[in-house]
């Protein structure tokens, strides 16, 4: 079990598992026990001593307390579960039943791995994929008891057995390994040509059903948090550009404060894991108000995939690195296709234009593969040269704004370097005051054919250079054109405006990765971050 600190610092004393006072119970836990303080106070009054600052330790002492009353581990476990509030995935072992593991969940992922003579508990399929491809996914308010050769799932309220379907895991352990790459992040960046192809080969009928939801809704919203919020912001731009529809993008953690939910609303979310707490909570609230819900997720059988009315399984394969790359780019491609389909349905574009756009998307994997093969070395050298830079501004206009945001986030997450993504127009409203020798800028320049955005972006660059600021320009113009405006430039092959921002995102990913390796960061497991954020 790997603990992600929510209550108490990262210390040995706060490390799982926690044992009861009599050492007959040991517990590990994901989530947050929201009422642990009054429970802890009551236990302390009864003479229980606590050695940590965590909420989890309460569980071990409660188990000891209730076992002494009933002399039955299962009854003690159920009684404990009835008292605690919040979110949890809990696993328990007891000296009274050394051949069994007890587990339960509420709003935190938990699944069983079912082998012939071995059983597993995990919060993700990858925990046991080397041993079995058969899984049972627990739902909220269920608990399970497993042993080497048997398992049983029960309803928490009635304690009656529940028959659960077996879920077949579609990938194998080899796809979850590094395959010769130094880090999962680099491997997953290099897998993006394939994940884009997978996204473009999704079943048309499933996409069309979601397009119908967009077409029928009176108000549609795009949800995500962190990287997927920037995916949603990207979607906002492509739906506006292609389908001439404005769908607000909302960060899932701000959903309650912003969204106007009713039965005519549609809430479409993106989530790599399908377990993101903030997004899951937002969708549950939307459904409680009668709204339609849909999602693009990467993990089959995940909580979001099972909750929403319509789901797209993006088929990107397991993403192991905490930093999302291939899943995010795939989701952007899927949102682009959905926007194109809605545009045709509304007659905002012709079928001919749709086919031209689809051809551009089909060419994207080959173009990205070429960039990975031919430009990675240059990007590596560039990142290493400027790895000492402590402050970056990432600038983009229009659809390049979410690309700037996501690229800056990658720099923060993996390299621990301060980076801000912002629209180019922000410069003259305050940010120009920051331009000096300690602040450098990366600018995502659109193709010249995208005339208005291109000219506005070049004006932003001129504003920075007029103040002697450093500019790394990532652009599609020929060698030598406007080169005097760039301190450094990275020239990309000419592509249509539709796919240009997607290509630039790959550059942002690589630049962050190579900066992180130059700084000797823990690339696949950055400090203080978790792959699937299942707590509030």
Explain the meaning of each model-derived region.
Residues 215-363, 397, 444-493, 511, ...:
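Glycine-rich phosphate-binding loops that contact phosphosugars or nucleotide phosphates
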Residues 1-183, 187-219, 230, 351, ...:
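Conserved short alpha-helical segments that host acidic/polar catalytic motifs at enzyme active sites
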Residues 185, 191-221, 289, 310-442, ...:
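Active-site phosphate/pyrophosphate-binding segments
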